[in-house]
C-alpha cells in the first residue's frame, strides 16, 4: 500500500487511519506529529479478512517489512483499529464550507475535517452553476495543495451542468445545459486536469456526441438522467 509523504514537513500518512473501537471518531494517521513516521504500533490492524494485533512499518512512502523501516517516530494506536485510509468520492462540503464556494480556506478546512474522520483522499463535487462560477471553482481546485493533517485532493466530480432538467435533484435547473466539449476543456484546464468524473445525461441533445469524444479523456458518469436502457447502453 502506498503512503503519502508531505514534502513540506516530512510527515507521513501511512494510508491507514485510526478509529476508536466505539466508532470512527478517532484521529487520522495524518494528524500525528510533524515528523517522519517509522511505525504505527499497538492497534488492531485490518488485514485480508479480519482485524489482528500488529504493527504497520513504513519506509519513506511505502508500507515496508520491519527490517526495512526508516528511522523516525512511532505512533501509538493502542485501543484503536488501524484501517486503510478511506476515500470520499462524492461530497459537496462539510463544516459549513462547500466546494462550490470556490474558497481556498474553505477547501483546506474541508480537507482537514475529512482527515480527522479517517478519510485520507477526497474527490469533492461541484454543483450545476453558470460558467463563471464553475471557472472559479476549477481554479481553486487546480491551485490546491494539501497541508499536513489534511486529506489529499485526488480529483473532483463535476456533478452538472450536463444533466437532465427533469432529474435535477438539488441542482438549479436554471443552469442545466447541453454538454460542451469547448466548455469542459476550458474548465479542465483551469482545474489543472483534476476533474476526474463528469456527470452526463446521455438522452439530452448532443450529449452522446460529448461522450463519444471525451470518454477517453475523463470518466463519464451517467447520472441525473431519464435515459432508457438502450440509450444508457449506447452511452
Enumerate the predicted regions with their spans.
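Aromatic (phenylalanine/tyrosine) cluster motif
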Residues: 6, 16-18
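Histidine-rich, glycine-flanked metal-binding segment
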Residues: 27-83
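Divalent metal-dependent hydrolysis catalytic cores, especially in the metallo-beta-lactamase
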Residues: 92, 108-137, 151-164, 191-203, ...
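Metal-dependent catalytic neighborhoods of phosphoester/phosphodiester hydrolases
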Residues: 99, 132-142, 169
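Histidine/acidic residue-rich metal-binding segments in metalloenzymes
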Residues: 177-235
Amino acid at each position: 500500500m502506498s503512503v503519502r509523504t508531505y514534502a513540506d514537513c516530512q510527515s507521513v500518512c501511512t494510508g491507514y487511519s485510526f478509529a476508536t473501537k466505539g466508532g470512527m471518531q478517532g484521529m487520522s494517521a495524518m494528524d500525528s506529529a510533524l515528523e517522519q513516521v517509522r511505525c504505527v504500533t499497538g492497534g488492531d490492524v485490518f488485514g485480508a479478512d479480519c482485524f489482528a494485533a500488529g504493527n504497520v512499518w513504513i519506509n519513506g512512502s511505502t508500507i515496508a517489512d520491519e527490517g526495512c523501516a526508516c528511522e523516525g517516530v512511532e505512533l501509538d494506536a493502542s485501543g484503536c483499529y488501524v484501517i486503510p485510509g478511506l476515500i470520499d468520492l462524492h461530497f459537496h462540503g462539510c463544516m459549513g464550507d462547500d466546494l462550490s464556494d470556490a474558497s481556498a480556506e474553505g477547501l483546506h478546512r474541508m480537507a482537514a475535517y475529512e482527515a480527522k474522520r479517517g478519510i485520507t483522499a477526497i474527490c469533492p463535487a461541484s454543483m450545476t452553476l453558470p460558467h463563471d462560477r464553475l471557472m472559479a471553482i476549477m481554479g481553486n481546485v487546480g491551485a490546491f495543495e494539501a497541508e499536513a493533517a489534511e486529506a489529499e485532493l485526488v480529483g473532483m466530480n463535476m456533478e452538472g451542468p450536463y444533466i437532465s432538467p427533469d432529474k435535477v435533484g438539488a441542482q438549479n435547473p436554471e443552469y442545466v445545459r447541453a454538454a460542451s466539449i469547448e466548455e469542459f476543456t476550458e474548465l479542465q484546464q483551469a482545474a489543472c486536469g483534476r476533474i476526474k468524473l463528469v456527470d452526463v445525461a446521455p438522452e439530452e441533445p448532443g450529449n452522446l456526441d460529448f461522450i463519444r469524444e471525451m470518454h477517453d479523456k475523463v470518466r463519464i458518469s451517467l447520472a441525473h438522467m431519464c435515459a432508457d436502457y438502450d440509450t444508457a447502453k449506447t452511452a
